């Protein structure tokens, strides 16, 4: 059996500032793949903790890291890249991720163009609409992580 190589990564499930009164989650459409909506995520640099990577990635991708951390998924969770995407990520077969559930403090600080843009648009959507909006190869991971946060009473 071949050993798969996964890129260490963090991902943020960003709840709107109205959480817990409203259960709306932030999703963004990738700039390089039209119609590909996802949570903000990104690689963990060498020597960086997952929490440090989370703050850096949010600042880079959505222009703000003014968040309140609500919870963290307790373990790494991995997914494989679709075969047509593998070439983009060098020698990696997929990504292993640490998920953080966070509440955004202010929506007026979101700026997708603050750094090199990775997203073309964003929306806050109701949690029940999430899975039908997300790219198919990430749905199982999203389903598992959301189910965990629901069981723990956060969602």
Swiss-Prot record:
Its cofactor is a divalent metal cation. A motif (Nudix box) lies at residues 42-63. One of its GO terms (molecular function) is mRNA 5'-diphosphatase activity. Keywords: Hydrolase. One of its GO terms (cellular component) is cytoplasm. SUPFAM superfamilies: Nudix. It is an enzyme of class 3 (hydrolase). Pfam families: NUDIX (PF00293). InterPro entries: Nudix_hydrolase (IPR020476), NUDIX_hydrolase-like_dom_sf (IPR015797), NUDIX_hydrolase_CS (IPR020084), NUDIX_hydrolase_dom (IPR000086), RppH (IPR022927). GO terms for biological process: mRNA catabolic process. Its EC number is 3.6.1.-. It comes from the Bacteria. Accelerates the degradation of transcripts by removing pyrophosphate from the 5'-end of triphosphorylated RNA, leading to a more labile monophosphorylated state that can stimulate subsequent ribonuclease cleavage. This is RNA pyrophosphohydrolase. It comes from Helicobacter pylori (strain ATCC 700392 / 26695) (Campylobacter pylori).
